[in-house]
Design a protein with these regions (language model features):
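Hydrophobic anchor residue at the start of the ABC signature
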Residues: 154
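Conserved structural motif at the start of ABC-family nucleotide-binding domains
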Residues: 5, 20-22, 137
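Conserved ABC transporter NBD signature motif
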Residues: 59-69, 76
Length: 162
């Protein structure tokens, strides 16, 4: 099976402290993983690496055959479906549910003044309907329950058909 994610001797160091230390990890396209550990163990850091939001201090991270540091992450990000509580904190609370899902097609969080393609808006509405969230399309993200926010994050993650 081809690897969708490969960490080789990955180290992430902050203030002379290893947050992640010499991690080797491979994920093939037929696998599903859960990342567990105590607070401060580096779970969020590992997921930020996998979502191209962070580069390792040393070692290599390869995602979908593209090595971080040697590829344009803005072209890679739309191919990655990712949902997390950390991502939810980056969503402006006044952002509509439709825009939270729609902006995934452009690898951004938060709508500014951009104009988005009609085809992407139609896809976002279809994804919302598939996840039974279409009735929330015009609601703001900050007014949703935690459960609704999590479902919107999943819809956002599948928006790009990763």
């Amino acid at each position: 099976m081809p690897q969708v994610l490969e960490f080789s001797d990955v180290v992430v160091r902050r203030n002379a402290r290893d947050i992640v230390s010499h991690l080797d990890w491979e994920v093939s396209d037929d696998q599903r993983w859960v990342v567990l550990g105590p607070n401060g163990a580096g779970k969020t850091t590992v997921l930020q690496l996998a979502d191209t939001l962070l580069h390792p201090t040393s070692g290599s991270v390869t995602i979908l055959g593209e090595r971080l540091g040697r590829t344009d992450v803005f072209e890679l990000r739309p191919r990655i479906g990712f949902a997390s509580s950390a991502m939810a904190r980056r969503v402006p609370p006044e952002e509509t549910v439709l825009d939270v899902v729609l902006t995934a097609a452009y690898s951004v969080t938060g709508r500014w003044r951009e104009q988005y393609d009609d085809i992407d808006e139609r896809r976002a509405l279809r994804v919302l309907a598939e996840w039974r969230l279409d009735h929330l399309a015009d609601r703001t993200f900050g007014t949703l329950s935690d459960g609704e926010q999590k479902r919107v994050q999943i819809a956002r993650a599948v928006m790009t058909d990763p």
